[in-house]
């Protein structure tokens, strides 16, 4: 056995131990919780206040100058109202509205780039103040003192073919009213089927004027929309790489 292999063996053991420790930390408490739920269906999340969730941050957007409210004493209609007696649409914190998620995206992009260039230059001095007497003993041709030749080429191709579709409805709650009257909404829906939970999260900013008379709004009219559709359970566990493989993918440079 060479002395080099014996010298590097402790280092390999230390690296392996470090990788195992990182993998254990990466799994953390979630692995312990999942071990305690073996053979059981995944639990649904508790219904919590969205503003009290960890990491919640109030939305801040550019606002126009405040306008003085105008009142019409001889009018039976309230400004912005769509109903004769009362506006049933969401307009304050805690109100509910239905978000119609209708996403149909299709993209087909193809790019192709070709580039080539060839350059050649010759430079020399045939005779300059008796330079031949110096170059002849050195066997140097004065007319070809410098010769350069370069060639470069590039060929690239790329294509994108994507098609996505998502159609569903989800109820959202108004979590914040901005100074200009726009509403910050957030909705979450969980559906458990056997041992898999499907999650749908919708959040964004809506204009009260875009809310329909039946208290619904299309997802295309939500500004800063954040729509997430995924799941957790046995199927997602199989689809994801193991913790050790994920750690190795992050740490290994090759």
UniProtKB/Swiss-Prot annotation:
UniProt record, GO biological process: bacterial-type flagellum-dependent cell motility
Principal localisation: membrane
Pfam family, one: FlgH
A single GO molecular function term of this UniProt record: cytoskeletal motor activity
UniProt-annotated location(s): Cell outer membrane; Bacterial flagellum basal body
Signal peptide residue numbers: 1-26
InterPro entries recorded: Flag_Lring (IPR000527)
Entry annotated with the keyword Membrane: yes
Gene Ontology cellular-component terms listed: bacterial-type flagellum basal body, distal rod, L ring; cell outer membrane
UniProt entry keywords in alphabetical sequence: Bacterial flagellum, Cell outer membrane, Membrane, Signal
Coiled-coil intervals, chain numbering: none
Similarity comment: Belongs to the FlgH family.
Subunit structure and binding partners: The basal body constitutes a major portion of the flagellar organelle and consists of four rings (L,P,S, and M) mounted on a central rod.
Function: Assembles around the rod to form the L-ring and probably protects the motor/basal body from shearing forces during rotation.
UniProt protein name: Flagellar L-ring protein 1
């Amino acid at each position: 056995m060479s002395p080099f292999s014996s010298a590097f063996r402790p280092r390999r053991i230390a690296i392996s131990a470090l990788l195992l420790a990182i993998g254990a930390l990466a799994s953390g408490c979630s692995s312990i919780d999942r071990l305690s739920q073996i053979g059981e269906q995944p639990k649904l999340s508790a219904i919590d206040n969205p503003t009290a969730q960890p990491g919640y941050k109030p939305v801040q957007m550019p606002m126009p100058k405040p306008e003085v409210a105008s009142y019409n004493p001889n009018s039976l209609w309230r400004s912005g109202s769509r109903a004769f007696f009362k506006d049933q649409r969401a307009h304050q914190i805690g109100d509910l509205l239905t978000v119609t998620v209708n996403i149909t995206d299709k993209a087909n992009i193809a790019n192709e780039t070709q580039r080539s260039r060839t350059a050649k230059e010759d430079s020399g001095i045939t005779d300059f103040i008796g330079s031949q007497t110096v170059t002849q003993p050195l066997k140097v041709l004065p007319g070809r003192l410098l010769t350069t030749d370069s060639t470069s080429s590039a060929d690239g191709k790329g294509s994108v073919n994507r098609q996505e579709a998502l159609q569903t409805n989800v109820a959202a709650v108004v979590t914040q009213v901005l100074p200009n009257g726009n509403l910050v909404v957030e909705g979450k829906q969980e559906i458990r089927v056997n041992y898999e939970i499907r999650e749908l999260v919708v959040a964004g900013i809506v204009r009260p004027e875009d809310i329909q008379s039946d208290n619904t709004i299309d997802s295309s009219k939500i500004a800063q929309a954040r729509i997430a559709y995924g799941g957790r359970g046995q199927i997602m566990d199989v689809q994801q790489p193991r913790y050790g493989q994920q750690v190795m993918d992050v740490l290994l440079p090759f």
